């Protein structure tokens, strides 16, 4: 035993070169499992020098996991185990901090692992040291490695703490000799191409490593028993690329023809002339992004809210095997009219609109007629909204509309003129004709309704009715007393003078007009005003123009729908029904409709909602695709289309100039351009800037606005765009006349001049299957051109008039055949040729007509 100890001591002393003293505890192999006692003390030997690197104990197959683990000395004949006690190094190595040793102990069977034993560097501290050393200690016979603490003979590795004899690896903490796991090699070398130590004993993967490998999704090395698979960095890149390829194939796989709900694209869809991208995607059961992508490939940069035409939608749908049926959005918004039985018509009360200049007494007149005060409800003398009232007289009912007289409410007055039957024009006898008076006249004339003039305030000393009659006669309102057709009534609303006569004149005018309606049909009317009431919700004043409205009826009001929950008369009393010419307040609307919007009762609430939805879509899209002459206004550019449709018999113009004289000169020049086909009518002319009331008058009468040395402000321009009214600006009078003249010349039917260029006689008929009959002809005069029109004449009677389909000379197609040559002629749409008939070729020249 002493010889063995001597051999070990000499070996250790030969390796000492730093002069450091370490304390080694030398044990025999047979004593490693024996417990220490006072009877058998340990034998200790102090070495004069030791390796710089503290030696890590190896686990022994036969120990219990708590006793020190020994390693045989290189030159000893028998195995001995040694252990180095933890001591501080000299000042030259004081900056080095040792790493925690995490060697795992594994049972010989390999079925499970022992708990990690305490590191000898911890002393009695329970905290595990996790920081790496700032300076790597020198190791005897080290294997190649990077940032790893390994024992003698250890293989290369990267950031892994392994026991002696372990193969190289990559970021793995494994027991001695372990070879499995990503990058673990048998006795291999790590980065740096350093030689590794001998391979350790094959060890199974611990349960912790298996869980870590599964969590990372790594395939690791080969899991076959006894087989090691080497994996290089190239292999890892290939693996990562394969995973990415698989991911992108799943993420961006080819789009199937299925929608967001899993429903396949329908074989046919119905769209409007213009459709939103999002709505098209919804109809085709596709994601909006797919539709947008297809449109971008077609060169269209769109978003989900952009609108495309039906042709583009059809091209896109065709790629998915879907057919598109185009329907008119405008037609979807129209409610079919009921057919009335003539026996159901009855006389209805007249609807009267009171117009006039502010403070001329129109509200006082209505108050006197109704015998109830409404003046207290006004603010600043201006009526806040259009009121509708019905009054009883000795001869019948009369419905009154009170339109505001101030310029700010001109648009509402225009709507009032559209629903009225008779206009009462109130003019103060002591004031005369004012600008608002002329505006009221223009609106009434545009609505083509009769005007009854009420000269008010005749009780005042300064009243001059004759002056008023003269001024109005200059504007086309000549009284019956002076040989005209306008009825005048002199009244005093404050003194109740002439009121009964005025009512009598109104009813007399209504009898002349023979106003009738059918109370047995569904109600149809117009929204006079609408508001949001905090207690009742949306409330609309409706003037029923035909039919009868009852509580519970579903309806459509503008773009909104609803069901009548309750109805009130003009006195605020609940009513069950409202007949023709009756104003009623209606609740139960799902929105606040605009004044002037149409009101229609429906048989079914579902149908009402559908029409409401179509009108909302139409409002979003605008007038695109709507029928010409129904929604868009007349412009100088589209007048020709209107005249072709027969929708324009008269071109209406509003003239505004800087001075009155210029306006009159332009008016006289334009009125001379009228023709029997199209009449030019200047409905209003005056001096001053173009204002909102001019735009609303143009909208109500479908007219153009001509500005001479005047402009419209931005607010008025925005209103004109909303109402689709065209405003044209000029600085020279003849420019106005010339442009209007050119526009009207475009309305004139062009003159067509026909010129016969050749005739041919049919001498033989050739019947060709699948083609038809071909006439063998001899050109007798002029020439026959393939592009010419032809007519077939038999016995002086024209049998057919059309176009040539083919022209042949022998077997060749030719463009023309001159006199004296034979040819074969096929006429498009005609086969009933007879020998002896004449084919006449002619051209038509279109000459544009001009105004004289």
Swiss-Prot record:
Chain positions covered by the region annotation G5: 492-494
Q: Which residues bind GTP?
A: 356-363, 402-406, 456-459
Keywords attached to this Swiss-Prot or TrEMBL record, sorted alphabetically, are:
Cytoplasm, GTP-binding, Initiation factor, Nucleotide-binding, Protein biosynthesis
Instruction: Kindly list any coiled-coil regions of this protein.
Output: none
Q: Which InterPro entries match?
A: EF-G-like_DII, EFTu-like_2, IF2_II, IF2_N, P-loop_NTPase, Small_GTP-bd, T_Tr_GTP-bd_dom, TF_IF2_bacterial-like
Stretches for region G2: 381-385
Per the database record, which ranges form the tr-type G domain? Answer: 347-516
Q: Where is this region: Disordered?
A: 1-240
Q: Name one GO cellular component term.
A: cytosol
Q: Name one Pfam family in it.
A: GTP_EFTU_D2
Q: Where is this region: G1?
A: 356-363
The text of the family note is:
Belongs to the TRAFAC class translation factor GTPase superfamily. Classic translation factor GTPase family. IF-2 subfamily.
Query: Briefly, what is this protein's role?
Result: One of the essential components for the initiation of protein synthesis. Protects formylmethionyl-tRNA from spontaneous hydrolysis and promotes its binding to the 30S ribosomal subunits. Also involved in the hydrolysis of GTP during the formation of the 70S ribosomal complex.
What name does the UniProt record give this protein? Answer: Translation initiation factor IF-2
- Species this chain originates from: Leptospira borgpetersenii serovar Hardjo-bovis (strain JB197)
Q: Give the organism's phylogenetic lineage.
A: Bacteria, Pseudomonadati, Spirochaetota, Spirochaetia, Leptospirales
Query: Gene encoding this polypeptide?
Result: infB
